[in-house]
Amino acid sequence: MKLLAVRRLFRIQRVVIRYRLDDLLFALPLPWWMLALRFVLPWRWLPRRKSELSRGVRFRLALQDLGPIFIKFGQLLSTRRDLLPEDIADELMLLQDRVPPFDQQLAIKLIEEQLGARICDVFSRFDEKPLASASVAQVHAACLKTGEEVVVKVVRPGLKPIIGQDLAWLFILARMAERVSADARLLHPVQVVMDYEKTIYDELDLLREAANASQLRRNFEGSDLLYVPQVYWDWCRPKVLVMERIYGLQVTDMAGLADQRTDMKLLAERGVEIFFTQIFRDSFFHADMHPGNIFVSTVNPWAPKYIAIDCGIVGSLTPEDQDYLARNLFAFFKRDYRRVAQLHIDSGWVPAETKLNEFEAAIRTVCEPIFEKPLKDISFGQVLMRLFQTARRFNMEVQPQLVLLQKTLLNIEGLGRQLYPELDLWSTAQPYLERWMRERVSPKTLLGNLQSQVEQLPHIAGMTRDLLERMSRPHASDPPRPWHDRKDEPVLRLIGAALLVGGAIQGWVMSEAATQLLTLTAWPAAIMLIAGLYLIVRR
């Protein structure tokens, strides 16, 4: 292991020298003792010609030379456009996770070990030549004994030691950056590496990917928008995934889509609808929707349907995040920057002590120029990125779910405008958002929420009774205090008032909207009313 670490260190050093990454480092505002290293590094003693490559290109090529783990780290960095200079972020978007396949016989051996059966006992046909190969796994086409056409994904052998060493060096570099640079500390490099560590280890577990794919397939069962291939659970293991083989055109195959006369406007709009459906209806979204993972069905090109694969990375939002995100977008497009600032504070995305006026002014300064463009030219992803950049100056905490959301939105938006350059994302999304906001406050939704809470009321009633008993019997070791001397009296009266109002509202809703449930649910409302009255009038 130590030998591997030393070899990796020398490899990193060679790449740094080759692409002159030390020039990028010493261009930063570093402490004097770090800048003094320029004069003691042997390779800097020799005259060197000025590189013709930009810093972004050099950084990208260096990551490619360092191998798959650094490539995937660069891909993760490319999603953090709120942290990186624009030229570097643009170059990192070009990173391709393509590596030569590993030995076919070794792949067969690994599959047989995982399945506990011979290939010929499970598959009537197995193509030894892989369909695709990436840094974490490779994919083979096959046919099950029962006749279904499938693909078999198998994790590369021996990855964990390599990943462990590369992550160790990434953590060392991140900690050094945090110690020597105040600017670097604002970017939270250690947190970025920690996020990457979780992502890369999650991708090694194919059962997790299978579960994600099954969930996404269930969410869009019978949908005209998106198809997700079936997972064959009987043949899925931690390092082997067997799922339905799909046939379609890659979403970037513009010539093929044109040849089958695909309705490109509808295809682009459906991509936006899929995104907002995942975010606001399901709160479960495919977070790796780059063009390599998206296909278009060849059936019914006048009503095109997407096909999604590779569900290794997914994201989700809490109901609170959903609500704040929707209201942020509405407030932004109304140019209500004070509302945007207030929502960031209310949501906890920025500290509560943030000065509202200063935050509002910063958001206005960054975002107002965006509205000089027509709506169809405004980028949702850029809007989120600008908001995050501004909020970071006010100590916004890193929100992993929002980072995944921003990455997914940038992918969907870029793809939609590639398919149909005139796509007006706001006009496409606005009706969906408005409908979602209406549904959140509809009587049906409120009743559903109330009914789910009713199931908890017996437990709450028991807790209320215990609380009242404890308050009426002070602890033996504590001297009794007069009620009027108790500091918690205002709080208890406020709780009592809330119980009174809550009980009254519940009783009214049940009598108006669910008469058939009245006999079942009247007693929890009565308990709330009695408890509230007791807390208010007691002496």
UniProtKB/Swiss-Prot annotation:
Chain positions recorded as ATP binding sites: L131, A132, S133, A134, S135, V136, A137, Q138, V139, K153
Assigned GO CC terms: plasma membrane
Membrane topology: Multi-pass membrane protein
Compartments where found: Cell inner membrane
Gene Ontology terms describing biological process: regulation of ubiquinone biosynthetic process; ubiquinone biosynthetic process
Keyword annotations: ATP-binding, Cell inner membrane, Cell membrane, Kinase, Membrane, Nucleotide-binding, Transferase, Transmembrane, Transmembrane helix, Ubiquinone biosynthesis
Pathway participation: Cofactor biosynthesis; ubiquinone biosynthesis [regulation]
E.C. number(s) listed in UniProt: 2.7.-.-
Alphabetical list of InterPro entries matching this protein: ABC1_dom, Kinase-like_dom_sf, UbiB, UbiB_bact, UbiB_kinase
Gene Ontology MF, one: protein kinase activity
Pfam families: ABC1
Enzyme type, top EC level: transferase
UniProt keyword annotation of Metal-binding present: no
Transmembrane segments: 23-43, 494-514, 517-537
Domain of life: Bacteria
Protein kinase domain boundaries: 125-492
Active site location: D288
Protein family (similarity comment): Belongs to the ABC1 family. UbiB subfamily.
Role noted for this protein: Is probably a protein kinase regulator of UbiI activity which is involved in aerobic coenzyme Q (ubiquinone) biosynthesis.
PANTHER family: CHAPERONE-ACTIVITY OF BC1 COMPLEX CABC1 -RELATED, PROTEIN ACTIVITY OF BC1 COMPLEX KINASE 7, CHLOROPLASTIC
Protein name: Probable protein kinase UbiB
Species, as recorded: Pseudomonas syringae pv. syringae (strain B728a)
